UniProtKB/Swiss-Prot annotation:
Protein name: Vomeronasal type-1 receptor 48
GO molecular function: pheromone receptor activity
Compartments where located: Cell membrane
Top-level division of the source organism's lineage: Eukaryota
Family, per entry: Belongs to the G-protein coupled receptor 1 family.
Residues in compartment: Extracellular: 1-16, 71-91, 153-193, 260-269
Pfam family, one: V1R
Lineage of the species this protein comes from: Eukaryota, Metazoa, Chordata, Craniata, Vertebrata
Positions glycosylated per UniProt: 159
Role, per record: Putative pheromone receptor implicated in the regulation of social and reproductive behavior.
Keyword terms, alphabetized: Cell membrane, Disulfide bond, G-protein coupled receptor, Glycoprotein, Membrane, Pheromone response, Receptor, Transducer, Transmembrane, Transmembrane helix
A Gene Ontology cellular-component term: plasma membrane
Keyword Glycoprotein carried by entry: yes
Cytoplasmic side: 38-49, 115-131, 215-238, 291-302
Length: 302
């Protein structure tokens, strides 16, 4: 690839990435503002309102931090020092962990809400909001502890002269870890991913089974009230199911790209493509939630 082609490719990736970030920031800002206005107007909150509002706030902050880091990838300037590099990268990774934790807990919460009264999960409905909040806090603190090694391994490297450094941005890079530390960190991350994504898969499978039962029951009964109720539950649950499926697929694809980049190819272009993939979920999710809000849809149609 000649220099002109390389610059053209770099420019296209930059424009695409910043467009993605801009769309994601707009969508999450709108969704967060909607939930804030809804809260202050005294509307009766749904059990899912808190995690959805929290998720939009997390994604908003994550995309803002990603935009700042991206300026150091696509735009040449004087660079950052060690403190700025450590702070931004650690904050970004922590927000990504929060996104995973909140998404997983949202899936579990929706499964609890959908459970019939005769099911054991229905017992958690009354305290589900409090329990989910505590679980999110616990998992977030745990993940931030796992990611604390970044405060040591991230460093400012204006002039990279060693191939062992892993590219993060023009000013920041990741110092190589010892084999033992890398193994411990990788194991902890894998356990975290398996646990949280496993919760999503279990809760998603549970909801699919319940929806199937609702559908069969609605077909057997002639009453309209049950059909309407089942339809409302279907709409809410299908939104979560779609997001969970999309999130799991993006997580798997992100892991594949990340591993291939670490093992085979490490350059600014491949990294730029990687960070574009990482933010697809944060960009798309607010619009999925917005499309299910009747108040917003009615206003937009009017």
């Amino acid at each position: 690839m000649n220099e002109n082609s390389r610059l053209h490719t770099h420019s296209n990736i930059r424009n695409t990435f910043f467009s993605e970030i801009g769309i994601g920031i707009s969508g999450n800002s709108f969704l967060l503002l909607f939930h804030i206005i809804k809260f202050f107007r005294g509307h009766r909150p749904r059990l899912t309102d808190l995690p959805i509002g929290l998720l939009s706030l997390i994604h908003l902050l994550m995309l803002l931090v990603a935009a700042v880091i991206a300026t150091d990838i696509f735009i040449s300037w004087r660079g950052w020092n060690d403190i700025i590099c450590k702070f931004l990268v650690y904050l970004y990774r922590s927000l990504r962990g929060l996104s995973l934790c909140t998404t997983s807990m949202l899936s579990v919460l929706q499964a609890i809400i959908l459970s019939p009264r005769s099911y054991c999960l229905a017992k958690f409905k009354r305290k589900s909001s409090h329990n989910i909040s505590c679980a999110i806090i616990f998992l977030s603190v745990l993940y931030m502890s796992i990611s604390s090694h970044l405060l040591i391994s991230i460093t400012a490297t204006p002039n990279l002269t060693m191939n062992d450094f892993l590219y993060v941005s023009q000013s920041c890079s990741l110092l190589p870890l010892s084999y033992l530390m890398q193994s411990i960190y990788s194991t902890l991350l894998v356990l975290r991913e398996v646990f949280l994504i496993g919760l999503m898969v279990l809760s998603t499978s549970y909801m699919v089974a319940l929806l199937y039962m609702h559908r069969k029951q609605a077909q057997n009964l002639q009453g309209t009230s049950l059909s309407l109720k089942a339809s409302a539950e279907q709409r809410a649950t299908q939104t979560i199911l779609m997001l969970m499926t999309f999130f799991v697929l993006m997580s798997i694809f992100d892991s594949i790209v990340s591993c291939s980049r670490t093992m085979f190819l490490d350059d600014p272009t491949s990294y730029s493509i990687h960070i574009f993939v990482m933010h697809i979920y944060a960009t798309v999710s607010p619009f999925v939630f917005i499309s299910t809000e009747k108040h917003i849809v009615n206003i937009l149609r009017g």
